[in-house]
Amino acid sequence: MKKIIGLVLSLTIIAGVCAAVLAYVDSITRDPIAQMKVKQEQAAVKAVLPADVTEVVPADGFYVGMDKADKILGYAAKGTDANGYGGDIVLMVGFKQDKKTIVCYRTLVAAETPGLGMKLKTPEFADQFGGKDGTSLAVTKDGGKIEAITSATITSRAVCRAIADAQKKIK
């Protein structure tokens, strides 16, 4: 009986120390991680807006890109689709003044298969979205004009849905 009590006590102490270490590491890394995510999002916003944007103004769930004369040149919004092959796909998508025509997108979050689904980050895949209407995207297998990533149709469809989600936010 004493042996069992000793084992339980030892395990409790070890678990308590581990919990304290994890809590400490979380407390010192939480702010830097949050700051990094903000910087990543800000960089993505600048990357997806038209090149002549000089000022970015946050709006209600999206960003407005303007020139020096305060003329609106484009919009950026975050779009999400939970049905990627590896889970959530989160994109920052840029649109022209008409709020429909895609400038480009940048991937914020994706856990797709390396070498297949992660090709959503490559220019070969991403560039085909530029100039297209964000309200009517579909892969060729579904009657659309987007060439799906070979062996990663689920990911390609999720990108189309994430872009549509972003487009809805700027209406």
Report residues per predicted region:
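Flexible, solvent-exposed loop/hinge segments and secondary-structure transition points
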Residues: 2-171
